[in-house]
């Protein structure tokens, strides 16, 4: 083990309910002779007020770059006004990290993760399909920035399947050529699907 990834890491910085970038937790980490020398990766947000802290962690940390994910998804589904921000994400997101002198390695670039759509589902579904979770399709994120390429779900239409394959190649190429640390969700490289389920933590099956 050469590092740790902290889920909902903004919670660790909360003191008196507010996110404090100078919190005691960060001081303890910086002073520890072992932990201060390993890779530290933050999911830099939580569910509380002011919890979205992308770009706000100390220089020794790398962060999941949620802005990268959203911008790349929007760009490849041809959303307007994304080109300038897409260029920033491609070049290491200096607008987020240069304030305190951080380099592109501060940015963990990703398009998909264990939460949400797989890459295949991102180009195959406009809407989540979480009915199998037993919550009336109310669970999971509704704004997925996805595009089904013209047909919802699996199809035998060659042009649609070709477009989906091209879209996945576009996103993979963007991820691998961007400055920063690329993160690929396991299974995306073989077009794994969760059949449109973007909250499949409770599915102990092929999904």
Residue ranges and their predicted role:
Residues 10, 46, 192:
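Short, glycine/acidic-enriched loop or turn micro-motifs at the edges of active sites
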Residues 14-21, 195-199:
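Short glycine/threonine-rich loop-to-helix capping motif typified by GTGT followed
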Residues 21, 25-186, 201-203:
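Conserved alpha/beta catalytic core and glycan-binding cleft of carbohydrate-active enzymes
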Residues 205-207:
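Short, intrinsically disordered, charge-balanced linker/junction segments flanking boundaries
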Residues 1-15:
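Active-site groove signature of glycoside hydrolases
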Residues 185-190, 194:
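Short acidic/histidine-rich active-site segments
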């Amino acid at each position: 083990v050469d590092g740790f990834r902290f889920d909902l890491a903004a919670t660790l910085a909360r003191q008196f309910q507010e996110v404090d970038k100078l919190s005691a937790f960060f001081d303890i980490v910086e002073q520890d002779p072992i932990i201060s020398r390993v890779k530290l990766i933050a999911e830099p947000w939580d569910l509380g007020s002011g919890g979205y802290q992308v770009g706000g962690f100390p220089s020794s940390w790398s962060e999941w770059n949620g802005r990268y994910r959203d911008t790349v998804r929007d760009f490849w589904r041809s959303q307007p006004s994304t080109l300038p921000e897409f260029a920033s994400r491609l070049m290491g997101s200096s607008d987020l990290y240069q304030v305190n002198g951080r380099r592109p390695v501060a940015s963990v670039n990703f398009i998909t993760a264990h939460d949400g759509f797989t890459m295949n589902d991102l180009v195959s579904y406009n809407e989540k399909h979480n009915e199998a979770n037993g919550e009336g399709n109310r669970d999971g994120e509704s704004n997925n920035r996805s595009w089904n390429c013209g047909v919802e779900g699996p199809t035998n239409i060659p042009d649609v399947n070709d477009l989906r394959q091209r879209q996945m190649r576009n996103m993979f190429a963007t991820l691998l050529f961007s400055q920063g640390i690329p993160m690929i969700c396991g299974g995306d490289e073989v077009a794994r699907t969760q059949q449109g389920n973007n909250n499949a933590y409770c599915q102990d099956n092929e999904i």
